[in-house]
Amino acid sequence: MSLSNAPLGQHVAYPSQYDPGLLFPIPRATNRASLQLGAALPFTGVDLWNAYELSWLDARGKPRVAMATFSFPADSPNIVESKSFKLYLNSFNQTRLPNAQALRDRLERDLAAAAGAPVGLEFISPQRFGELNMAELDGIYIDKLDIEIDTYEPAPQLLQCAPGDEVEETLATRLLKSNCPVTGQPDWASLQVRYRGRPIDRAALLKYVVSFRQHAEFHEHCVERIFGDIMRACQPRQLTVYARYTRRGGLDINPWRSNFESAPPADVRTARQ
């Protein structure tokens, strides 16, 4: 489907009843072709979506609320356009369902159909809200490095290795900003780079991350671009790239890509989320 047909950036009436047809899939292959990524991906991964505004009516018409985490596998054929996801979730607001399991069943079925692959779902009831924690990404934060930069479109040539023996370390920054490719709205994120290999020059990495500041691309695609650029520039033996984007429309998106870790990290929101 063409992005010109997506709800994002258009005035769309909010639905009053459940409508799975609102979900708008976008093929991953379109963007991956520009990154020279084929069917054999150099990573595994998942896109973790957190929904904070989930509500429906029970069988007697009383509102119910919950939160949910959705796990879209990185090898699924499609991503789901975020505004269409928001509208779809809102279509449950005035929909009567016999119980929470009926909601789960519809969510799992509809999202799998849109993504082209099974989608994981963790349903968080109000009884568990008090158990939820907040934490920052692990790692050595590079934000205080004294750099000068005037490049605000992705510049992989900025990346370079530092002298020294092979290291195993985790670097992090809160300075990633990209932009929605449809509306131009800013997307803010914290980024974590975990690797084993020649030392990555930290100032160079920070400049590279900042260079996304005027770039227009979906969250998932930005993370895959970062992964590929680091692999080409520094050739680490092991690499994980993880971004946690701030929420918009009651949803946050957190793409994770790795060539050595088999399980995604715990889905713990950061302070800005």
Swiss-Prot record:
Annotated EC: 1.7.1.13
Residues reported in the UniProt entry to bind NADPH: 82-83, 248-249
Pathway listed: tRNA modification; tRNA-queuosine biosynthesis
Sites where the protein binds substrate: 80-82, 219-220
PANTHER family found in the cross-reference section: NADPH-DEPENDENT 7-CYANO-7-DEAZAGUANINE REDUCTASE (PTHR34354:SF1)
Catalyses which reaction(s): 7-aminomethyl-7-carbaguanine + 2 NADP(+) = 7-cyano-7-deazaguanine + 2 NADPH + 3 H(+)
Protein location: Cytoplasm
Gene Ontology MF terms: preQ1 synthase activity
Pfam families: QueF, QueF_N
This protein's UniProt keywords: Cytoplasm, NADP, Oxidoreductase, Queuosine biosynthesis
GO-annotated cellular components: cytoplasm
Entry protein name: NADPH-dependent 7-cyano-7-deazaguanine reductase
Subunit structure: Homodimer.
Leading EC class: oxidoreductase
InterPro entries: GTP-CH-I_C/QueF, NADPH_dep_7-cyano-7-deazaG_red, QueF, QueF_N, QueF_type2
Alphabetized Gene3D superfamilies for the sequence: 3.30.1130.10
Function: Catalyzes the NADPH-dependent reduction of 7-cyano-7-deazaguanine (preQ0) to 7-aminomethyl-7-deazaguanine (preQ1).
An annotated GO BP: tRNA modification
Family: Belongs to the GTP cyclohydrolase I family. QueF type 2 subfamily.
Active site: 180, 187
